[in-house]
Amino acid sequence: MVIGAVLAGGISKRFGEDKLTYRVGGKPLILYTIEALESASKIEKIVVIASPFNWQKFRELGLEVIVDALMVGPLGGIYLALSLGDSFVVGGDMPLLVPEFIDYLVAKFEEAKKLACVPRWPNGYLEPLHAVYSRSLREIIEGYIERGEYKVGNVIESSNPCYIPVESLPERWKWAFFNINKKEDLRKLKTFIKEF
């Protein structure tokens, strides 16, 4: 069992307003992510990692929140999540998560006994915000943060991870990587979610 950690500290610059509380199909966008995590059988507890500027919005939704005072981007969020235990880390702007895919990744992580289990595309591109990380990686991340190095990909590649080839996954599972950056992305989302 692992923690489900939802990174929610971004400023939504391209979206034009707080995208995670933007109502999509009648509910805040972040709740799609939360509900998928709640449906995954291998997720023990869910926390939202938020910035000092937006954490109250998520608490008002009844979510457990950790405030990210580090403010060094996703790497800081992963670091904080790992203080609670092994974590499946995801962006709060990913409304198409597949609970079976989450459980599959966690199972692969548990089986591989590596510091991270990360989906990887054929071109080498990683999906660091749809990945499982070991609590043991926290000390390594701390060293990167102390050196001012904040690229999650560098931490992953230095940790001898378990890679999951994206091309081997069912097509429906690949939708999970879709994230909302701009309001135009909501139009793309309509092709996936029938509530529109």
UniProtKB/Swiss-Prot annotation:
Kindly list the positions annotated as binding GTP. 7-9, 19, 68, 93
Q: Give the UniProt keywords, A-Z.
A: Cytoplasm, GTP-binding, Magnesium, Metal-binding, Molybdenum cofactor biosynthesis, Nucleotide-binding, Transferase
An individual GO BP term: Mo-molybdopterin cofactor biosynthetic process
UniProt-annotated binding residues for Mg(2+): 93
Which catalytic reaction applies to this protein?
Mo-molybdopterin + GTP + H(+) = Mo-molybdopterin guanine dinucleotide + diphosphate
Locations listed in the record: Cytoplasm
Any notes on this protein's domains?
The N-terminal domain determines nucleotide recognition and specific binding, while the C-terminal domain determines the specific binding to the target protein.
Q: What does the similarity note say?
A: Belongs to the MobA family.
Q: What is this protein called?
A: Probable molybdenum cofactor guanylyltransferase
This chain's source organism reads Pyrococcus furiosus (strain ATCC 43587 / DSM 3638 / JCM 8422 / Vc1)
